[in-house]
Amino acid sequence: MRKLMMLFLTLAAMTVQAQTAKKFTVNITPDGKANMVAYLPEKPSGRAIVDCPGGGYSHLAVNHEGHDWAAYFNNQGIAFFVLTYRMPNGDRTIPMGDTQQAIRMVRDSAEVWQINPEDVGIMGFSAGGHLASTVSTHSEYDCRPNFSILFYPVISMNERETHKGSCVNFLGKEGQKDERLVKEFSNQNAVMRHLTPPAIILTANDDGVVPPVTNGIAYYSAMRRQGNDCSLYVYPTGGHGFGFRSSWPFHDQMLNDLTVWLNSHKAPRKDAVRVACIGNSITDGHGIDMSDVKAWPGQLQKLLGDGYVVKNYGRSGRTLLQKGDQPIWKEQAWRDALAYKADVVIIKLGTNDSKPQNWDAQAYESDLRLMIDQLNPKVPVLNKKGKPTKKMQRSQKPRIILCTPVPAYKPSWGISDSVIVNNIIPIINKVALDEHLEVVDLHSIFDNADGKAMQGDGIHPTEAGDSQIAKAVLEILKIKH
């Protein structure tokens, strides 16, 4: 029996080695207490996954929730990194910081490790699933993963509906008494529309340690409500902690489900033109189900094809005016838009600025110019000797396109079509002329003659109305791309 077991372990090790070109350990912290073991594939696809094993934030199950997965991923050309993160002992910033640094490190080493920095995912099990979902919902763009794989994840930090030990270890005994903290790190409450990465959740119906309904399913429900890309697989049995154990009856089915999901989420082409759409609720897709796909940026993506990657940075109710009641400048979406380093930026802001409590013509013009400056700062022109002169100019990228607001057919929420027509549009045209920018005149193009292009509030387009916007923007984009 012992000989058979040794033979099995030897064959398993040979399988991993056959698909793994390099295996090494990288320190995340100088003392090596946080580190990750890298498994680089023989034939890299460019995709990478950082793995967070579970263990209730008290220890790590690094085998069946870590190293045992290496051959599966390497066989698909996916670089795999098993993260040893430090335990929080009540300080949540410790494991969060380790994981965020691991993602940064993978992206920073992308060229050397043959990884596409826009195709770095995270995988987590149980408490590691909470950590993975926390980094997916609470991180800035540079260390937020591009997709999440969550196995029987702890999502809630309410000890009455999840694994109590994970809650106490992550937040601390005092933190558990803070309702604000409990809510903030119950990650179904932290899902960001358009910004939280696509996710797949895999759990068992009979999990008695981390109840699916108040955890994994709650995360799925939050993602679906926001119109984000999310898939949910609930297996009939398996309890908690099945991981990569081949003895689990649904092991092969689970691997097939995960493989199909990974294959259906292709990485963006490295040479794809990056497009950022910055706007208010009309860009966000207010009132449109599955707006990530059906709002005008999503429709634009479909029209453009895989030669482009279109990101939706719309936020409902937001203003261009910094002193408006809800300025876009304070939003994660704005920070993401800057960090994205787009090739093309489309700005569609002004509808909410027309409200009486917001409108200020002088400030609107100066804030529009400031936004352009932040997206594409002017730099000194160099002379023949390569030295800077007093003359300033903008770079060719990003190409900035301004959109006028669509008509406001009703004065809902105090929005004024008169202010839009007589004040906002002339300012947009003036700034565009001064800065040599293109304008998409949506106010003139938009057609609601049949009443099917606009929702009942008279402000927000329907899916059909958003189709008009997408096609109008497409026509301008085609001029140079």
Model-assigned labels for residue ranges:
Residues A61-D68, F81-P117, S246-Q253:
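Catalytic nucleophile-loop/oxyanion-hole region of alpha/beta-hydrolase
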